[in-house]
């Protein structure tokens, strides 16, 4: 199965991504597509929720995953795409135009959910090595630059131990440019029940929240 990890370097500077590019360049087989992401945080305005029910909901859109949006709440997730089938259009359930799920939250459910924050990375770079696909992007919020994010993907059917070894190689490269303080997450949202895109979104939330 495919495995992923996400690293967020909050103490990076806007030029750290160039340093990382330089240290990684000797291992790169190809530079692939540009990519972007946006993570939105929503808070429920409903009072008297059960203690076990969190008031926070996350929405992550990834351009390099067919512009799909993953919505996470209470260790559960749904994935919504931007493709409407002919059947949905013909029966009036869809206009045929894409509408991200977070637009529904802000336009039709705004009395329940209020957007609190938006964190995004635009025009990131994708690197392919012999072992991994690594995506790097500077991260911004409304207050300005937040840090550097790395999305690490292994498409080979390797063991968890082998994936850890490959991630360790990336961490060693970060150490070479004096980056040792960062958040790393490679967890499954529900341990033992891997769901690729939901787990990846969960990793984004854990390092960026």
Curated annotation (Swiss-Prot):
**Which superkingdom, per the lineage?**
Eukaryota
Tell me the compartments it is located in: Nucleus
Entry's Gene Ontology molecular function annotations: protein domain specific binding; TFIID-class transcription factor complex binding; transcription coactivator activity
Which terms are listed as keywords in the entry? Activator, Nucleus, Transcription, Transcription regulation
Q: Name one GO cellular component term.
A: core mediator complex
Query: Would you kindly state one Gene Ontology biological process term found in this protein's UniProt entry?
Result: positive regulation of transcription elongation by RNA polymerase II
InterPro entries in the record, alphabetically?
A: Med20 (IPR016532), Mediator_Med20 (IPR013921)
> Pfam families, from UniProt?
Med20
Q: Does the keyword Nucleus apply?
A: yes
Q: What is its main location?
A: nucleus
Q: Can you state the subunit structure given in the record?
A: Component of the Mediator complex.
The record's similarity note reads: Belongs to the Mediator complex subunit 20 family.
**Role summary:** Component of the Mediator complex, a coactivator involved in the regulated transcription of nearly all RNA polymerase II-dependent genes. Mediator functions as a bridge to convey information from gene-specific regulatory proteins to the basal RNA polymerase II transcription machinery. Mediator is recruited to promoters by direct interactions with regulatory proteins and serves as a scaffold for the assembly of a functional preinitiation complex with RNA polymerase II and the general transcription factors.
The name on file for this protein is Mediator of RNA polymerase II transcription subunit 20
Question: Its encoding gene is what?
Answer: SRB2
